[in-house]
Amino acid sequence: MQMKREPQRTAGLLLLAAVTLSAGDRRVSLLPKLQPGQTLIYLIRFQSDKTVKTESKVVTPIAPNAAQIDAHGLLLVEVLDVQPAGAKAMIHARGQFLTLDSGVWLKKPGDNKSGWDRQHVDPHGKTIEFTISPDGSVNEVKGLDFLFPEQQQAWQQWVARFALAWTLPANGMKFGEKWKLEQAEQIGAPISGLNWARESMYVRDEPCQASQLSIMGDLSASSGPPDTCAVLLTTATLKQKSSSKDATPEDFKLHELRTMGTAKGTNEIITYISLKSGLVVRATEEASQFMDVMVAKADGSNRVHYNVDAKSHSEILLVTETPLDRP
């Protein structure tokens, strides 16, 4: 499945933001207008490259694996319930991968060639249920642990982009406005007190359109009417509130383990949200994270030191026509 898109330049977005500031001070609500029973399909493409260096005199299962992942597939989302909660609604939904073509390469020291293990996910696979709360947090997640790691990461990329509108001001946004938010890192890590400091800016409006997918996997604009999207630029920085000398999470303490170390990261996200429906039509993310951590038993024995350097790129696209729609 090949996707050819022109890269978006942050500098260009900020330059055009200055032009659109004169369009007025109107506030626009970017929340999606969802109804129970509504279904959506998103194409997700996720690529990551994680390098791990480990120093240890003992054999340990806790160090993460170095790996490259290249996955793309279709996610079907069904809205199960919409509960009004003030200015923002709480959404209960279910997701299922219709297709997921993925490649995973578990890198080992000295590897010079890519050892890709490719797989196609059964379209009759398991589902995942979840709730998006009015503050944008994703809760009551069921079924995630039963998915393949590539499915988990692809779904996490999608839900993070889809839930962005819930983190924005309840009274809407206007051109040039910035919105800051701090959220706890929701993916488990051996370092406690990790938080993302996010800043979103409403850059401009731009013509946009959902996508359609051919039976050959070619991507093009859908045959539906054109739309207009609000373009949001979001930057995020990973901050550590715990001490580097004692960064032990609670679940590590329960297993009589102690950790120390540091973590940092940056993300840049560009999101296109339909002004008509409030749906995310397209979103891209570039992410980079680094972690240097020491894990040992509570008494200081059996120390394992490793650092992780990870980079990823993801893209999600709203798809209104697919080969699965055709007989």
Each language-model region and where it sits:
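Residue-level marker of intrinsically disordered, low-complexity segments enriched
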Residues: 1, 17, 314-317
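Hydrophobic h-region of N-terminal signal peptides that target proteins for export
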Residues: 14-23
